[in-house]
Amino acid sequence: MLSFLFKKEPQEKTQNRSVELTEILKKLKEIYRGCDISEGRKAYLRRIIEKYGYLPYPHIRALEELNAADTLFGLEVKWRLNNVFKNNAFCFSDDEISPVARAGINNSDWIKREQHNIKLINLAALGNGNYSPAPGNFVDWLKQLLILPSGNPEKSILATTIYLIPFHPRDFGCAYLPSSSGISNCVKDDYLTGKLNITAEKQVQLFITFAQLAGHPVIYDILPQTGRFSKEVLAKPEIARWVDVNQLISSIELEIDDIVKTYETKYDFDDVQIVRSVAKATLKSGSDDMGEHYKKIYNDLSEKLLPKRKQISEKMFLKNEQQKITDRVKQIVASVHCTTTDKINTEDDITKQGEVINKLIEEGLWSVPGGAWCSAGVPVFERMSESGDFPLFKHYDYKGNDVSRYANLDCQTPYFFVHLENGEFNRPVINYYVNKVKSLCKMYSFDGIRFDHIDHVVDEFSQKGDRPISYRIPKQVLAKCNSTLKQENKHFAIVAEYMLGGNNIKEYHREMHFDVLWGNDIISQYEKNPYEIIKNNQSLKQYNEALLTKGTVSVLKSYNNQDGEFRDINQYPGQLGEQGDLFKWFKMKFIPGGKKAQRPVMYVDGDESFTTVGTEECIGAEISLKRAKNYTFFEKFDAINRFALKNELTTEGEARIVTQNDNGFVCWTITQNQNNEILLIAANYFAPTEKVFDSENGTTECTIREGMTVFDSSIEVPKEYKIVSEYIYDYNEKEYTENEYKCSGNTLYFDRLEPSEFKFFKLVKQ
């Protein structure tokens, strides 16, 4: 994959990858002055990295304090700790670049492991946004590798998994609307390209390889849709549905004429002619704003026209009609490129993307968009926009209700997986898609993927029985894709964006072969108190212990809930305040589910330093993140993670609720079979401030709930246990350290617990 740096004679045997990478590292040191680092600086970095397995800095500190030489030296230490670097050279087998492979793991259980972390990272955002919005460069990426937390190899907990946001060029500033399968120019490091002639694609490949050698698995977002006029849609028009808006408009105009004929005795003739003219004109552009007198006729016309619109649109989506339009699109694409249709096969053949798009729009040819999260059937053409620049569609759910107000996906192009008129699967498109995903994963050597936008594929909104009825990717396609990827790579892990609606866990796990489900933390942050989390763990345990369940599935715990696109959710973690955010992290690390309910945690770059805004803007605009410089928050965040990774009870035990009161007081324990020790946690589970949603009389109201201090609480410890110590955060050591706890009896008293304050103790069986 990286031999691009070194030209070889045709007969020369391919170099071992470790030799290649050693040469690449040497060249990187040359251009980045990697030798300009003092022995004292080396000793400092070596001591810290060897102690922790990584450099415990927030990314903003790494950006401001580490130069390229520091970064490369630090990574050498980290690679050495991962047994892939010795005597200033890489040393590994070509089939063991992935840390999962090096660990000897031949299944996907590694990503499900309790205490395993998954960090969402946007490469473009890794620059210093506090200084400039310019995207991060290659050295900035490497600084992130250096600071990523390690795991616990003795417990088979791998180091933090990198979850990469799509790095393709995009439309409308949205990472989930790729305009091609290439690499965005915002990700490319021009300096590295100029010095070593490394393309953007090769830079990303090199970063992923370096990450895996540093112990970090890498997964990637996979999309079941593409951009409206992406290169792949132009190269292979048959993978999408298409409309000819000119033909649709002509057909609707005829229907308008027929309906108007029935108005001869119902309305004034001149009024009807005015309304007819407006109705026809607005199909192409302009506004339908008019006075109340005309509006009555117009609304009557629109009501009678609606079923005709549906029929006209549905007819155009029939298999034979789609074939005709696809053939026209192919002819136009070939004509613009001055070639024949048989010469256009891949994205590389699309060299005049803009010209092709303009010509297609001129001819009235548009790929068909998705719809609303709950829409079914085909989109119904309504009209062109007021400016006449793009088509507008109405969307309906499976009951026929208009759900257009939820349609935020009109700018994407779903793949043409199924003929909705009869449920027939479009096998060529399915095979194309599966091979595309497989090739992408092979190109970048991913250890897993996360499937986007699949949270309703098996409920009544998207299928009737087993027959797909919406634009969403069908479960049968997901099953085929996932099983293919797992056959290619036994340790390959697959995450589903499924938020547990409809209780469809078995379909995602047993039928579609997913390993981890997204969970509902995004929409239910305010409900996730310790009691509810433990209840969630128990539900997962019950499923995994069922007789028909083969293997296990996991449900992700999501620390970050940034979902600003949907303001009705609006569950940003920063709203909890610093202490509230720390307690949220603590809950995810100190409420383990036990052997049959293991759950990893996902967080977003910036969370660890209490960066509360900006992530979504960076993902869309491909700019660097403005980061908070809250080192104290980071140090506590990091200390909680390290403690939980090392402790036998948090890695292997199971949390059980002792008591949870409405005033905010909660107590739970973590126990393990055959272990004489238990952890006991007491806390005030209310955050200092939090948005909550109250539903009453069919309406939902969002309010700000302020947490209150809990006074005079106590808990009785069973007589067979003795309270021996309390773990208290040491600001000097930046660790939770064990301190002897002197207690005359077996009652723990708490005079006061502030909102989100937590305490934890070790109890030993007497």
Feature roles, as predicted:
Residues 321-373, 491-621, 685-686:
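Conserved alpha/beta catalytic core and glycan-binding cleft of carbohydrate-active enzymes
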Residues 298-316, 325, 420-502:
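Active-site neighborhood of glycoside hydrolase catalytic domains
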Residues 209, 220, 225-253, 453-526, ...:
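Aromatic- and carboxylate-enriched substrate-binding clefts and catalytic-loop regions
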Residues 119-121, 162-164, 218-220, 449, ...:
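Hydrophobic faces of well-ordered beta-strands that scaffold small-molecule active sites
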Residues 2-6, 10-217, 225-431, 695-696, ...:
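N-terminal structural segment of carbohydrate-active enzymes
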Residues 589-595, 607, 614-661:
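Aromatic- and carboxylate-lined catalytic core of secreted/periplasmic carbohydrate-active enzymes
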